[in-house]
């Protein structure tokens, strides 16, 4: 069925993206850390230049297809709630999104592939929903079936991002979709399970652990003590205040941001370069 193929393809795409991100990121960092033949200044310049180049490439791709910018989850939610945006769930947008995500994450920016994978999963589902009869195939198969398949694709995307089939189904049902049925649940669960299984199998083929939840940022098991609750609460309060201040500052500074296409690309490149100087 469509759900089977969607799950397999989403899992394969997620593996390919994460593998390429790992290769590019590792090459960028290891070249600086291990190449002692060049001076420290040369290595820093190389590090910043490559990071800025990756960011520039990613930002420039959005000029080809503007709907590929950002996480893309809002487009998926809009499509599943009756607001049609054919460009946002087109294969062109999906291809640009995949390439752009690989370069933006590899650049070292504080971004990840999780949101884009939801968008990409929905696009893959949309492609199967359209089928071989052209771009308006969903009008023949019915709006409800079209939404079901796109919902299943979005669920598979999130499931492959976090390694959680149930999480993908819950996200699609609670956050993305306004219309839900037992058939949608079965399709979404099948897609999500297959996507996670394929991703785990492909990771196992290159020597990574198969069948276990892996957190790249936590290699060792840690236990907290009761007396640490106080500092945890204080940290949460301070983080909330800091987050509110950052949000307010961003909203105030947004009016001064460059609105031209060249300006937006230059801004992303400059931000990446400045971040690299602090790493």
State what each model feature region is.
Residues 1-279:
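Alpha-helical transmembrane segments and immediately membrane-proximal extracytoplasmic
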């Amino acid at each position: 069925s469509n759900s089977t193929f969607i799950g397999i393809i989403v899992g394969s795409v997620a593996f390919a993206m994460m593998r390429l991100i790992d290769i590019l990121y590792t090459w960028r960092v290891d070249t600086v850390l291990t190449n002692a033949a060049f001076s420290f200044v040369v290595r820093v310049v190389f590090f910043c230049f490559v990071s800025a180049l990756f960011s520039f490439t990613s930002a420039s791709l959005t000029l080809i297809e503007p709907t590929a910018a950002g996480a893309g989850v809002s487009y998926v939610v809009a499509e599943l709630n009756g607001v049609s945006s054919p460009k946002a769930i087109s294969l062109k947008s999906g291809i640009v999104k995949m390439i752009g995500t690989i370069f933006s994450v590899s650049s070292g920016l504080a971004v990840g592939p999780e949101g884009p994978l939801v968008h990409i999963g929905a696009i893959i589902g949309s492609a199967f929903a359209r089928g071989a009869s052209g771009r308006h195939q969903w009008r023949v198969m019915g709006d409800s079936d079209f939404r079901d398949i796109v919902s299943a694709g979005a669920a598979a995307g999130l499931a492959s991002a976090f390694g959680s089939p149930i999480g993908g189904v819950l996200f699609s049902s609670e956050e993305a979709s306004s219309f839900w049925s037992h058939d949608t649940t079965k399709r979404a669960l099948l897609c999500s399970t297959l996507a996670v299984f394929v991703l785990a199998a492909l990771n196992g083929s290159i020597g990574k652990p198969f069948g276990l939840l892996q957190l790249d940022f936590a290699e060792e098991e840690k236990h907290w003590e009761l007396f640490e609750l106080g500092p945890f609460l204080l940290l949460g309060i301070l983080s909330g205040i800091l987050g509110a201040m950052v949000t307010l500052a961003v909203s105030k500074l947004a009016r001064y941001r460059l609105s031209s296409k060249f300006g937006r690309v230059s801004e992303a490149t400059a931000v990446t370069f400045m971040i690299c100087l602090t790493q």
